[in-house]
């Protein structure tokens, strides 16, 4: 099996027995253990924002080629996995909390819609997850990417569904941001998150040749151990079907719920008329009647269950910004599971440890094979993608910088809006230029969409009055960070907010930043040949 994105196809054998076959090598790929998890981004994206009204999948999508009618107590894969409750859903799949009888633990089970293009997309995702699994164990970044534990094909009345089994993680970073009232997460906690994400990105980019393409707070999950999961009670409503509810889109929706997945090209899956007849005559036992939908029952705040994330922060990890980051209702405490970091006025203070993992690789691609140019969620979208220029792994570092700013301040770094005489794209590029002040006009004019945004002189076509506001000044004037801390943050983020993707600093190099020294693993250091992506193939453009 190569790492170039050539597709796998699920081969359905006898009922109840399936295997995924690599048609390139004709080898059976055994059910994987330990890869990644696209599921929880969908799961936790909803769980973290329970305050916002949740909606369910459309009952009309339960048909041949659509969702599998999962029911509580249903058994999957030779009775190994038993469904306990519904965690979430997306246009791509539904996600369920299940008990793994073999491993004696709870897992997240994602059941993909059975239509051919959804199956093909899931096979692409599995290939990417396998590449991540097979990478160098010595690279610590691997531990900060979610793990796929198993995969198989499940046959039901609506067709053959690719299923993926993931480790269950806690809530995502959006939940963390909200728990601090959008006023900023303590700096000591942000530093830990930043370091872990950077080494994870270096592992993806340098070791695996993979670009995430959709980094955002919703797709970074906080780890939670199995002991906490053992005490999660099943809600009383999980077995009660309900009709489809509101379909309004809100910020809490993540990769799956915010938009349909990007459809990738791959080898077609056999979807014969005979298979359709077989399922019509022999539907799965106890399957739900058409038109009924089990309501999602995501976890209540897992932050409160995570041992190192309980209690209040009081005055830890505030680093010169006590007023900015003082939150009496914070979910963190300074227990035994903590770090001692430099605090205010040179003092040393305990900061709770936090471990995060990158999730949702459903839109990921290879550095040598981009599936689409429609990548990145709006607020985390890089200028090269907006302009329609060539892009590469460095686009992830732009998104990373936007996430760190949001963690520190509680606000988006860029939040473009439509105007009477300009588009969101106009406003987005204008906001970027206002922050960076300078930009390469040659690049600005080189994209597929450049003529819509710039005139021949490289000036914005539809927005003429700009208010330049460099990052350090934004942090100091708007968010009241001290001048020293604002400078430190600006020095850390600015190299990854370079307009030109080829000159953007790579993740491995930034993991060695002095700003992260106190949270970095002293036994692990990423050696790079330069600050930018000289030694990262596909850094700024697709490898051809």
Curated annotation (Swiss-Prot):
Coiled coil feature spans: none
InterPro entries, sorted: Kinase-like_dom_sf, Prot_kinase_dom, Protein_kinase_ATP_BS, Ser/Thr_kinase_AS, SRPK
The reaction(s) this protein catalyses: L-seryl-[protein] + ATP = O-phospho-L-seryl-[protein] + ADP + H(+); L-threonyl-[protein] + ATP = O-phospho-L-threonyl-[protein] + ADP + H(+)
Modification after translation, per record: Phosphorylated on Ser residue(s).
Pfam families: Pkinase
PROSITE patterns (alphabetical): PROTEIN_KINASE_ATP (PS00107), PROTEIN_KINASE_DOM (PS50011), PROTEIN_KINASE_ST (PS00108)
All copies of domain Protein kinase, residue ranges: 81-516
Residues binding ATP, per UniProt: 87-95, 110
Biased composition (Low complexity): 237-254
EC numbers on record: 2.7.11.1
Biased composition (Polar residues): 281-299, 327-337
Alphabetical list of CDD domains matching this protein: STKc_SRPK
Any single GO CC term annotated in Swiss-Prot or TrEMBL for this entry: cytoplasm
Location of the region described as Disordered in the Swiss-Prot/TrEMBL record: 235-299, 316-341
Locations listed in the record: Cytoplasm; Nucleus
Role description: May play an important role in mitotic control by altering cellular location, degree of phosphorylation and kinase activity. Abundant expression accelerates the exit when cells are in M-phase and also delays the entry into mitosis when cells are in G2. Phosphorylates prp2 in vitro and so may have a role in co-ordinating pre-mRNA splicing with the progression of the cell division cycle.
Family: Belongs to the protein kinase superfamily. Ser/Thr protein kinase family.
Name of the protein in question: Protein kinase dsk1
Originating species: Schizosaccharomyces pombe (strain 972 / ATCC 24843) (Fission yeast)
Gene name per UniProt: dsk1
